[in-house]
C-alpha cells in the first residue's frame, strides 16, 4: 500500500501509461500480499534460474509479454566439488570446519549465474533485469545462500531453512541491482525445483490423482 502513491504518480507523469479513464498500467512485483516493486513501462524482464545438480538453466523472460527472450544452459560450475549433492555437502562441511577464504561452492554458483545473466542481457540488448527468480533442490539452494548443508546429508535430514526468501541479488554475489526471489522448499530432498514444477503444471488446479516426476540427477516422484 505504501508503494502505490509513488507508483501511480510515476505512471501518470510518464504519459501514455493508462487507459484514459484514470487507470494506470504497469508491472507489479508481489511478495505475498505486499507490493515490493513496480515498473510503469511496457517491458519488465526477469531472470529465471533452475540450479540443477548437473545443469544450470537460465531464461531471460519478458514478463509483460510472457515470452522467453533468450535462454542458456551450462554444466554446474560446482561439479569439480562432486557429481552429487552428498559429495558437495561433504566439501562444504570441510570448508565450514576450516573457513580458509570465501566459500568456494557459493562463489562458483554465484559467478556462474552472474556470467549467464551478463551473456543473456548482452544477447537481448538489455541493461539489467527487474528481478531474479531462483530455484533448485534444497542442497543447491543452501549452497547458493552459503548455508551449512551438513544436516541435509544425514538423518534426520534437517535443512537450515525451507522458507522463501527475498534479498538483493548482490547479497548472493550475483552481479545485478535487482532483487532475487528464492522459492520455498518442501523437505531436505523435495526442493524448490519441485515447487516450481508444481506451480508451472497448475497442480493446485488439477483433479486427483496427480503425478509429477522429475528425472534429474536426483529423481523425485
Please tell me what each predicted stretch does:
Residues 60-103:
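Short glycine-rich, Thr/Ser-proximal phosphate-binding strand/loop in the N-terminal lobe
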Amino acid at each position: 500500500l505504501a508503494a502505490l502513491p509513488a507508483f501511480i504518480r510515476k505512471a501518470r507523469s510518464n504519459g501514455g501509461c493508462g487507459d484514459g479513464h484514470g487507470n494506470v498500467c504497469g508491472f507489479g512485483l508481489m511478495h505475498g500480499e505486499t507490493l515490493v516493486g513496480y515498473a510503469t513501462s511496457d517491458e519488465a524482464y526477469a531472470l529465471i534460474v533452475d540450479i540443477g545438480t548437473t545443469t544450470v538453466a537460465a531464461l531471460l523472460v519478458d514478463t509483460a509479454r510472457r515470452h522467453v527472450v533468450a535462454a542458456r544452459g551450462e554444466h554446474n560450475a560446482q561439479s569439480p566439488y562432486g557429481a552429487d549433492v552428498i559429495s558437495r555437502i561433504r566439501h562444504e562441511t570441510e570448508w565450514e570446519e576450516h573457513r580458509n577464504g570465501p566459500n568456494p561452492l557459493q562463489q562458483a554458483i554465484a559467478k556462474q549465474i552472474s556470467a549467464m545473466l551478463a551473456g543473456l542481457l548482452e544477447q537481448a540488448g538489455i541493461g539489467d533485469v527487474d528481478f531474479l527468480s531462483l530455484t533448485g533442490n534444497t542442497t543447491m539452494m543452501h549452497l547458493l545462500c552459503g548455508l551449512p548443508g551438513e544436516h541435509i546429508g544425514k538423518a534426520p535430514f534437517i535443512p537450515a531453512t525451507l522458507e522463501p526468501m527475498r534479498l538483493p541479488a548482490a547479497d548472493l554475489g550475483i552481479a545485478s541491482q535487482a532483487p532475487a526471489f528464492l522459492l520455498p522448499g518442501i523437505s531436505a530432498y523435495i526442493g524448490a525445483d519441485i515447487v516450481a514444477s508444481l506451480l508451472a503444471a497448475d497442480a493446485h488446479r488439477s483433479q486427483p490423482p496427480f503425478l509429477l516426476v522429475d528425472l534429474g540427477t536426483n529423481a523425485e516422484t
